[in-house]
């Protein structure tokens, strides 16, 4: 069987990892082994946190809606139940935006939900 020399393949693999490690400090951007470790960890963290970000934003929206709803004498769960009953289809992101940026509109939404 013929001998396979891995020069080009190995160099490409290492360059790819070192390119991903650009901007890291000291050996983390210069040495392949340490760069490989920190890049793998960074990619794992990025993958996990892309999913976590969705949870975190939902928690933030719920906290904002709850705080705004309590100013009008309603809890978050009461408000969401009333909105569902009134068939008002605003998602949590929209409600949080209204609560923060347009309080009168949020008050109108609460009054509409409360009326039904």
Swiss-Prot record:
InterPro entries: Ribosomal_bL20, RIBOSOMAL_L20_CS, Ribosomal_protein_bL20_C. It holds the Pfam family Ribosomal_L20. This is Large ribosomal subunit protein bL20. Keywords: Ribonucleoprotein, Ribosomal protein, RNA-binding, rRNA-binding. GO terms for molecular function: rRNA binding; structural constituent of ribosome. GO terms for biological process: ribosomal large subunit assembly; translation. The keyword Lipid biosynthesis does not apply. PANTHER family: 39S RIBOSOMAL PROTEIN L20 (PTHR10986). GO terms for cellular component: ribonucleoprotein complex; ribosome. SUPFAM superfamilies: Ribosomal protein L20. Binds directly to 23S ribosomal RNA and is necessary for the in vitro assembly process of the 50S ribosomal subunit. It is not involved in the protein synthesizing functions of that subunit.
